A protein has these predicted regions:
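Secondary-structure transition motif
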Residues: 1-146
Length: 146
């Protein structure tokens, strides 16, 4: 069974809050905090919640939804939870930025074009993924789609 963990990005403070004690109380380095996960979930205009995938990249970095992966050739992807497939996926940056990838009509074309290799169920993140940041703390990385 995978470990269930979350991170919460505080939009106004431009800071990631961590659940360091596994008590679902989230704090940052300056001790800003929220008391539980429901505070963040119920205020999406103030907080963005990221769930741990249960996997690590090739450098041992924990992989969360919203993380950015960079391949050796420089191509970037974003880790997303694809609702239609019920799994985490490595979404190519250009598709992440330019398409409604959660839309049901998009899904068949996505599978036809990329196959199932991008699904975590069918790849080995610990061998191939290289997490270089995330969409909240490193928005500058989103502009480098190739």
């Amino acid at each position: 069974m995978r470990e269930i963990k979350f991170q919460t990005y505080w939009i106004a403070g431009h800071d990631m809050l961590y659940d360091t004690n596994n008590d679902l109380e989230f704090r940052d380095k300056e001790n800003h905090w929220i008391t539980d996960l429901s505070d963040a979930i119920n205020q999406p205009e103030r907080y963005k919640v990221r769930q741990y995938t249960g996997l690590k990249d090739k450098n041992g970095v924990e992989i969360y939804e919203g993380d950015i992966d960079q391949e050796e050739n420089g191509d970037k992807s974003v880790i997303v939870f694809l609702l239609k497939a019920g799994t985490y996926c490595v979404m190519p940056m250009d598709i992440y930025l330019n398409n409604d990838y959660q839309n049901e009509s998009f899904f068949p074309d996505f599978i036809y074009g990329f196959g199932y290799d991008l699904f975590f169920d069918n790849c080995t993140p610990d061998k191939y993924l290289n997490i270089i940041g995330n969409i909240y703390e490193n928005p500058d990385l989103l502009g480098g789609a190739s």
